[in-house]
Amino acid sequence: MRWLLITTGMALTFSGAAALRPSASTEAAVCPRADEPKYVGSKTCQKCHFKEYGSWQKTKMAQAFTSLKPNQALEVRKKVNLDPAKDYTKEAACVACHVTGYGKPGGYPEVGKEWTEEEKLRAPLMEGVGCESCHGPGEKYSPYKKDNKEYKWAELVKLGAVHADEKNCKSCHNDKSPTFVPFNFTEKIGKDTHEVPKLKFNHDCDHPHGGK
């Protein structure tokens, strides 16, 4: 989804090769609050935003998890001295920034623990830096938007929506990442996969920003 929120990595189009090191705020994700809304996956967003979903699927953010698999993103791995044959999908420090909702309710389950059957089925749906990586877990605000065509941003925030700002991007795109390249957020946000057009809704299930 090339939206105003496209994924956690929105501040930097990364070739997706290597382990982006999560900041303290990202690592805190493995300790969710009891009332924290669940992640529902980008396919849920697709129901109303199918054009944006199709656009997002073509981005490197969508393929971020694939880049962690053996013999992927070889040029970048070579550049930063990462083992080209290693499976980085088993490294929590890498996975946290290459999936959606790592360790959070409804998100990608934690690496290194035994997964339940439900988590095994859920994990593939949360691979890659998806819509909710930048927009927040959609369990509550997604249905609210469908039922309330006139809504305010503040209402969505109370339901778990997140503004895709520089701080959000830098939770993963920071100097703890072996592939990090300094960037100007203001310049980057308007280019390529980080472009922030208004969302367009493809049928009568919703309207952009409460508009008609």
Predicted segments, located by residue:
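A contiguous, mid-protein "functional segment" used to position or interact
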Residues: 162-184
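Positively charged n-region of N-terminal signal peptides that target proteins for export
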Residues: 1-4
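Sequence context of c-type cytochrome heme-c attachment sites
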Residues: 19-128, 132, 138-163, 182-212
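Bacterial N-terminal signal peptides
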Residues: 7-15
